[in-house]
Amino acid sequence: MRPLLQNFLQGQLSSIEVSEALQPSNTLIDVRTSEEHFQGAIPGSRNHPLFDGLERSLIGKLYRQVGKEAAVERGTSIVAPQLEKFLNTLRPFQSRLLTVYCARGGMRSKSVTRFLSSEGFRVQQLEGGYKAYRRHVLDFLNDFRPPLIVLHGRTGVGKTLLIRSLPGSIDLENLAQHRSSIFGAVHLQPRNQKNFEGLFYSKTCSKPREEFIFVEGESRKVGQVFIPEAFADAMKNGKKILLKASMETRVRRILEEYHPRDEETLFKIESILSALKESLGKDVVEQLKTLLHQNKFEDFITILLEKYYDPRYEHGMRDYQYDLELSAEDLEQTQRDLIGFHSAQPIHGNKTKYS
């Protein structure tokens, strides 16, 4: 057996648990297939696949139908010619502490950890792999109910702009890569549930549980993903602030965010409009398409707000009671007002002193 291959199968193995692996000092290496990595990965991890999807499927089939020995033999025959190349892709990280993971902490991550250790790397395996990480994340999210200051207001009022500028905030739309509206995916690549939850955990796991957090009022679903149930409950019970701005201001802010930059974007927007025929009627949709092609974007946005967004918002929020109402015409002033409201909040559970 060649030395590289022998080390791949029989080298030393060091392993750690999820909480240790997530320390900033670790560089995470995901040796699963690129398809697995895309479907869900630990944020910040680098994908260095040991097999491609077809190879993994073949090895898994052998394991189930013939047995472990046959699967290992086949996997070894696939890996052997590529070990030198695989090693070279990781050489740039040799000075770092590496943590290798696969799906469940099985042969893929064990073999790579042994191999890299024999080649002089500081390396350890993540016990339980990505499955253990997911369990760790979900355990946290199922119990994460922080005190929240929830910003409400009609579309275009500036909620997202404020969330991005406020200290101690969570930008759910950024984590989801979706603006939580029918046009919310324009210019963005929405994330799936697993990656959203991983990023949500990374953003929140170190926050003090008693400290108020700013968040934008959302429904349970943001684009393709669902907000964790415990956090959604915290949003319902949080301090609610209503932001107000003129139609002119709202139109301007929406245009800055969504402005059609090319023909592809215009085509996407027009395609989405077709889905509104039932709620707006054919005539209004055709009017909107005409305005879009005439580059009359301000008129286009105004009609959408008046006939679609505002009525839906009023219906969904009519039973809400707000702790505070603020003008959002001047966002710098609104930011100062919100920070003042935040500073006035006592320890979680006591009544606010702000007036």
PLM features: residue spans?
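Conserved NTP phosphate-binding and transfer environment spanning the P-loop NTPase/kinase superfamily
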Residues: 234-239, 244-355
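Flexible, polar/low-complexity N-terminal or interdomain linker segments that lie immediately upstream
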Residues: 1-43, 137-154
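Catalytic cysteine-centered active loop of the rhodanese-like fold, especially the PTP/DSP P-loop
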Residues: 73-127
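Long, charge-dense
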Residues: 125-138, 255-259, 269
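Short glycine-/polar-rich loops that comprise or flank the Walker A/P-loop
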Residues: 43-44, 146, 234-239
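Glycine-rich phosphate-binding P-loop
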Residues: 108, 147-167
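Positively charged, proline/Ser/Thr-rich regional signature most characteristic
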Residues: 22-92
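Conserved nucleotide-sensing/catalytic segment adjacent to the nucleotide-binding pocket
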Residues: 167-234
